[in-house]
């Protein structure tokens, strides 16, 4: 069954899921609640304390936790640690936890799995974000390549529209090309109803100081941006978030947790390296073990929990993306995103240490 826009009113409608035919509940019911557990025979409705927000000027109601289907894991498919069926189950688990924002991309190779996972679900209760890698600047018709990529994504995802279609990993030297040669095609796709909103994602590893996004946010072209932001590199707080909030551009937060923030020794190594390079003043740590300080002062059970809480409650961040192939990690990560902010003294300490750092990614 191909997922299409809902055309009915707010009353009941008949939908068929495999061999199970159910009477769907009025649309109003879904807002603020979880989705029907369609993959378990529709025998119950799970309600979780997910929080929702409005994604900038798009007006989309999105969960504050989003499932990232790329990253180092790619739902466990990158290193074949998980089967396709396990990846499908993971996506459905995320939805069962209240996540309605799913982010994938052409280059991740996970669009087919996302399509299979959401097949038969109410399409208008999901927000699907995918991306197109930039064609070569020497391409004779790069706009046509963008349109071709969109058609492929629609087919793989089993839908007739994408909520947010991004230009993927745009670097500073490629921004003018993206704006002048590719944006017209994106606008045409939006006018045709094949995409609802236009986004751009930065290449955080080659551009950790956000040069491309600083340039792009000077113009009113983008509905949504994807930004690298974490407690080791909070530079977007100064350079991007004031602009995104002023212009009401939706913000997706990637790189909340990477290798350096997944375990205490990784963070200790980063601090030692920064001290050695003089990036943070010697003595600024007061001889304290930073992971231990964070744990004691915040009550976080793990360093990733603290890192997710840091991002979730940053003014300007709408959706924090989390990616994994492990069901237990997914549950823990979503729970972390839903926990309270870090205490002010912890945030102040982190600002003192990392507030001027704009070249780390956390990898």
Model-predicted regions and their roles:
Residues 57-59, 115-123, 154-158, 188-190, ...:
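Acidic (Asp/Glu)-rich catalytic clusters
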Residues 52, 170-362:
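Beta/alpha (TIM)-barrel catalytic core signal, keyed to glycine-rich beta->alpha loops juxtaposed to Asp/Glu
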Residues 80-93, 142-156, 206-216, 307:
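Short, acidic/polar
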Residues 71-84, 132-144, 173, 205-206:
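Active-site mouth loops of central-metabolism enzymes
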Residues 43-126, 185:
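N-terminal binding-site loop/beta-alpha segment at the start of enzyme catalytic domains
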Residues 55, 67, 102, 114, ...:
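Conserved, mostly hydrophobic/aromatic
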Residues 155-173:
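Active-site groove signature of glycoside hydrolases
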């Amino acid at each position: 069954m191909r997922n299409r826009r809902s055309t009915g009113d707010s009353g009941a409608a008949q939908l068929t899921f495999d061999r199970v035919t159910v009477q769907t509940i009025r649309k109003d019911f879904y807002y603020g609640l979880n989705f029907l557990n369609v993959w378990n025979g529709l025998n119950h409705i799970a309600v979780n304390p997910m929080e929702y927000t409005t994604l900038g000027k798009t007006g989309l109601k999105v969960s504050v936790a989003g499932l990232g289907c790329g990253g180092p894991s790619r739902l466990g498919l990158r290193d074949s640690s998980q089967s396709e069926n396990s990846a499908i189950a993971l996506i459905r688990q995320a939805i069962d936890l209240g996540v309605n924002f799913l982010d994938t991309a052409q280059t991740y190779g996970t669009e087919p799995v996302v399509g299979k996972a959401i097949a038969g679900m109410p399409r208008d209760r999901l927000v699907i974000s995918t991306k197109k890698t930039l064609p070569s600047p020497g391409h004779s018709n790069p706009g046509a390549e963008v349109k071709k990529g969109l058609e492929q994504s629609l087919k793989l995802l089993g839908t007739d529209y994408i909520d947010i279609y991004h230009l993927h990993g745009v670097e500073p030297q490629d921004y003018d090309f993206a704006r002048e040669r590719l944006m017209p095609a994106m606008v045409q796709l939006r006018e045709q109803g094949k995409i609802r909103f236009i986004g751009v994602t930065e290449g955080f590893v080659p551009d950790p100081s956000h040069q491309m996004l600083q340039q792009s946010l000077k113009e009113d072209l983008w509905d949504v941006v994807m930004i690298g932001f974490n407690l080791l590199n909070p530079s977007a707080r100064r350079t991007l978030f004031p602009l995104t909030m002023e212009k009401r551009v939706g913000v997706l937060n990637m790189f909340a947790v990477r290798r350096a923030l997944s375990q205490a020794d990784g963070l200790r190594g980063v601090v030692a390296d920064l001290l050695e390079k003089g990036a943070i003043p010697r003595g600024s740590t007061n001889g304290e073990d930073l992971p231990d300080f964070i744990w004691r002062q915040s009550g976080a059970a793990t360093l990733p929990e603290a890192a997710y809480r840091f991002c979730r409650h940053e003014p300007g961040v709408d959706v924090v993306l989390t990616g994994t192939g492990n069901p237990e990690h997914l549950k823990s990560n979503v729970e972390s995103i839903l926990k309270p902010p870090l205490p002010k003294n912890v945030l102040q300490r982190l600002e003192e240490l990392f507030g001027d750092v704009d070249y780390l990614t956390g990898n």
